[in-house]
Amino acid sequence: MTSRFTELAVDCHDPERLAAFWCEVLDFKVIDRSEGKVEIGSWVPTVEDVRARQMPPTLFFVRVPEGKAVKNRLHLDVSPIDGSTEDEVTRLLGLGAAMADVGQGSDRSWVVMADPEGNEFCVLRTLAP
């Protein structure tokens, strides 16, 4: 018996705002929305596709009443594909991200940031040639 990683759910205050932010970051599209929920992805999942092979998971933003209180136990890592890490950090700041300090120190090869609701994520070294 096997399970597939199909989506990552993110509790948040404003699903529309976070979905829009992450669509810009990852070049994803909104693939489903309902009251208090927005799902984004790089593809429109079907049961047949997911059964046939491992596919990239979607991000599912769900409105919850409580706010974020502590550092995330799970976070996303992103890697720029067509520019430098520094240029990507600048772009993400322009989209509404913020720099974050989780005790990582300044001598790291990655940059810790937070999305507009304070969820930490890391920008890793570029994959650009």
Per-range role (PLM):
Residues 1, 41-42, 46-47, 54-71, ...:
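Domain-length accessory/inserted modules outside core catalytic folds
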Residues 4, 36, 57, 72-74, ...:
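Residues that flank catalytic or metal-binding motifs in active/ligand-binding sites
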Residues 11-56, 94, 102, 107:
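Core segments of cupin and vicinal oxygen chelate
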Residues 1-19, 74, 127-129:
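N-terminal beta-strand motif that seeds the catalytic metal site of vicinal oxygen chelate
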Residues 13-15, 76-117:
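Vicinal oxygen chelate
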Residues 42-44, 124-128:
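Short beta-strand-to-coil "C-cap" segments at the C-terminal boundary of structured domains/repeats
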